[in-house]
């Protein structure tokens, strides 16, 4: 990506790649990720490593739940990535591969495996890396009793330093991610309930009209 590209340029490229109306509930997600990826793409010390790939996909998938039409979500992700010089297909491939590899690993082997994906010394940290770490820990603990969010955040913090991640920021970023995820789930549930209620009202009106017509 050209160093001279501005946020306005990135937004223009995004809207060209994704010329669809985005519902207000999801517009903020798109705007925030677009700006975040733009800033990272201009950070000379940033490297789109494995933890970043997993984290970006996790954040997008978490906050895109309930998006309609669902068929547009892949195109939305591709547009967010391509408008900032990232390869969506490569990110998705890395995400799927690492999540699959993490499954079933015991704590010790997981720690050794994660060390091979540590942030290089002097590299720029992104909150998406913390989310990526948490996502892999969740995949490994899928069948364990301690797979709740608090335990995962604690485990992420314990592993952070050994992976070159700032411990305090990891805890803060994951706590914020968790609270935002809960709020998004509640918002999506409310929207779906509202849509369902409107659908029921419409069906009742149609039934009443049909009864009046037949009587």
Swiss-Prot record:
Coiled-coil residue spans: 182-213
Any Pfam family matching the protein: ThylakoidFormat
Superkingdom classification of source: Bacteria
GO cellular component: plasma membrane-derived thylakoid photosystem II
One biological process term in Gene Ontology: photosystem II assembly
InterPro entries: Thf1 (IPR017499)
Keywords: Coiled coil
Keyword Ribosomal protein: no
Family annotation (NCBIfam families): PS_II_psb29
Protein family per UniProt: Belongs to the THF1 family.
Function: May be involved in photosynthetic membrane biogenesis.
PANTHER family: PROTEIN THYLAKOID FORMATION 1, CHLOROPLASTIC
Protein name per the record: Protein Thf1
Source organism: Synechococcus sp. (strain CC9605)
Lineage of origin: Bacteria, Bacillati, Cyanobacteriota, Cyanophyceae, Synechococcales
Gene: thf1
């Amino acid at each position: 990506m050209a160093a001279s590209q501005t946020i306005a340029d990135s937004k223009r490229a995004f809207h060209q790649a994704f010329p669809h109306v985005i519902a207000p509930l999801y517009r903020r997600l798109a705007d925030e990720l677009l700006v975040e990826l733009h800033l990272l793409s201009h950070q000379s010390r940033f490297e789109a490593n494995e933890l970043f790939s997993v984290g970006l996909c996790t954040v997008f998938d978490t906050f895109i739940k309930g998006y309609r039409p669902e068929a547009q979500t892949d195109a939305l992700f591709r547009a967010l990535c391509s408008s900032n010089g990232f390869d969506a297909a490569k990110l998705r491939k890395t995400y799927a591969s690492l999540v699959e590899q993490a499954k079933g690993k015991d704590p010790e082997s997981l720690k050794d495996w994660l060390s091979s994906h540590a942030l290089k010394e002097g590299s720029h940290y992104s909150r998406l890396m913390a989310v990526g770490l948490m996502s892999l820990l969740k995949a490994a603990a899928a069948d364990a009793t301690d797979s709740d969010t608090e335990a995962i955040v604690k485990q992420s913090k314990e592993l952070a330093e050994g992976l070159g991640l700032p411990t305090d920021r990891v805890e803060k970023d994951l706590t914020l991610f968790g609270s935002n995820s809960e709020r998004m789930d509640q918002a999506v549930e409310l929207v779906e309930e509202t849509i369902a209620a409107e659908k029921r009202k419409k069906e009742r009106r149609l039934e009443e009209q049909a009864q009046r017509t037949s009587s």
